[in-house]
Amino acid sequence: LVLFTGGEDVEPSFYGEDKGRFTRCNKGRDNLEFQMAADFYNVPKLGICRGAQFLTVHSGGRLIQHVENHGVSHNIVFEYPVKGTYEISSTHHQMMYPFNLKEVDYRVCAYSEYFRSELYYNGNNKNIDLPKNFVEPEVVYYPKTKSFCIQGHPEFSSISDDFKKLMLRIISTMLNV
């Protein structure tokens, strides 16, 4: 298992956009992690926060460069591989956007219980058009790259131990580790 962790924003040029005013990147780290992801292509990968965003881009997805109201604890709704609503801590202002991919190339496992952001900015600092059935993805699996991506921070101490144990079981199930 290869773990990709939190940190600076992913360089937007890697997903075909210009850098917006809210975006702060470390292109050196991005280059290093793209090389690591290539070297370990067939190894299961787990991304948390920025790591989830990075693995989304590595898997061919895009990012929404800026969203509002996601830097706090909030509820997410799991639909796969379990069902239920759980609290998770978040510190992000960017968001995974797998919806440009074919549906067979990703699975949204969990999403925000309700829309937290009123605006979704791209690199031109403009509100983007969202697909018809848009949800704010919080947990996404990319089968081709064996990448399981968690936008929030299940490891934070404010989250219940039961949820942490559940997340470990989900990660083990999804990545077969």
Describe the function of each predicted region.
Residues 4, 29-43, 66-177:
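Amide-donor transfer/coupling interface in amidating biosynthetic enzymes
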Residues 7-10:
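Short glycine-rich anion-binding loops that position phosphate/pyrophosphate groups of nucleotides
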Residues 12-19:
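Glycine- (often His-adjacent) and acidic-residue-rich active-site loop
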Residues 21-31:
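A short acidic, glycine-rich active-site loop
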Residues 40-60, 153:
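Catalytic nucleophile loop
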Residues 63:
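Class I SAM-dependent methyltransferase SAM-binding "motif I" and its flanking Rossmann-like core
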